[in-house]
Amino acid sequence: MQRNSVEGDRFSSMTDEQLVALCHEGEDLIPVIVSRYAYVVKSKAYAMRVDFSEREDMMQEGFLGLLSAVRAFNPQKNVSFSTYANKCIFN
């Protein structure tokens, strides 16, 4: 647990695009990105006003969408990672 805290501090000044680029180079920074986007995933799931088990499923799908966004993000498409990730989270 402390390791993630240290990593979070180490990478806190980096942009999402920089973190994703490092992921593409083989760095395991998924926990840092998930930590940054957890609020987005959870707030979108809670906005759906469904029961607890469905909300949990939606959050799981949202995090899978986020992971997909990390894998597929292409900075040459001239769109920010944040915009791309938000589209992937619940689409």
Residue spans for each PLM region:
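Alpha-helical promoter-recognition and RNA polymerase-docking modules of transcription initiation factors
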Residues: 1-91
